[in-house]
Amino acid sequence: MCNDISEILGIKVKNLKITQNLGLHVHKNVQALFYEGQLTYHPSACECCGIKNDNHLIIKHGFRKTNVYMGLIFERPAYLKLKKQRFYCKACQRTFTAETPYIQPRCTISNEVKRMMTWKLSKVTSEKDIAESLCVSPSTVHRHLKVVSNSVKTHAHYVLPEHLAFDEFKSTKDVEGAMSFIYCDSVTHDIIDILPDRRKHQLEAYFLKFSRKQREKVKTVSIDMFPPYIALIQDLFPDAEIIIDRFHIVQAINREINRCRVQVMNGFRTKERPQYNKLKRYWKLLLKAPIDLDRMIYQPYRLFKSWQSQYSLVQYLLNLDETLKETYETGHRLLSALKANDIQQLRFILQDAKTKDTSKGLKRVIHTFIKYMPYISSTMRHRHLTNGPIEGINNKIKLIKRVSYGYRNFWNFRNRILMISKVFVSEYKK
């Protein structure tokens, strides 16, 4: 049976001995556990002048008493009344205090509590909730966040990865631009850095801190269709291929198909209400790929008197308006070519679509695709490099803002994002 209080509490630190259990006492209006301990040893040299401790040159010089917060024990805050040994150096006639890895000098919170604080800061939890769970003040948690965040900052001497992904997100009101900038490694999905402004001149000033040799090593950059990103990459990453994110291409096509449906639907709003209701109810089927529509199984559908299959229902809706039909067919032909990674077929469809009576919105999208065709070709060559990882990171950023009820200061927000993404890395990324 073990009767050593230090071993029972799991404190295995050299030279630190817990001597007594003082029991429960009220501290800050809460019942807390109190222990008494002592820290002493024989120093090998003076910490002030560095002289070796020969012939009793350094002698013991009393104790300094401090209350060290140990964290929660049995769901109660625990404190250690620690007596730290003081030493006197006869050579320099100065005094110094004994030190231990259990607690930092001139600090009253143990390193175990700080490690737990770091772990909780890496989770999507508000700082106030972390402080409450550890029985410390929110300002203590915030100070610790600032200290730990220094270890995850990006510096100009860092090596840029070969594959990058750029994106933006809405951060805080104290930034100058409307959106903030974030970029990550497309392969490992690790955040590299977060900037307060996505405007081109700000990004140029930032990336010019990296040497040209580092920037030339970048092979691909995945982006959405934001024109300043394209100009920036061409200027600063001369050997990098620009990849238009596949999701944004699909989203642009689907959005215009849906907009055309809404325009046609609103035309039937006062004239033919049944057609309006059908277009409104079955909008999802118009966005579904034609090859995935069921043609064999007929069943009753609301608003239809006769049984329909998914395919026949869609054909009925398309026959209501010729523009809707052309927009639907052209849009899904583009999506099919994109899914098959057939660049020649995509080029043919884009040229052929110029003669089709599609909606104005889809014509604008087609014009944009023709303009960005070299970058869309890169999208098809690098089918596994997308902005998907960084879009997932942006979803987590929104979750952090929601849980924390927003942030006022951009740098505090940035530090928290980097803490959550960089402090503890998954095993498969190591």
What is the meaning of each model-derived region?
Residues 122, 353-430:
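Basic, amphipathic alpha-helical segments enriched in Lys/Arg and hydrophobic/aromatic residues
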Residues 35, 89, 130, 164-169, ...:
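Short, conserved catalytic/metal-binding motifs centered on acidic residues
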Residues 1-100:
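Short, conserved DNA-binding cores of transcription-related domains
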Residues 75, 80-85, 93-169, 176:
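Extended interfacial segments that mediate partner engagement and assembly in macromolecular machines
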Residues 143, 147-222, 227-232:
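RNase H-like nuclease fold core
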Residues 224, 234-278, 391:
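Conserved beta-strand -> loop -> alpha-helix junction used to position metal-binding or nucleic-acid-contacting
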Residues 107-115, 193, 340, 356-357, ...:
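Acidic, glycine-enriched active-site microenvironments
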Residues 276-358:
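Helix-loop elements that line ligand-binding/catalytic pockets
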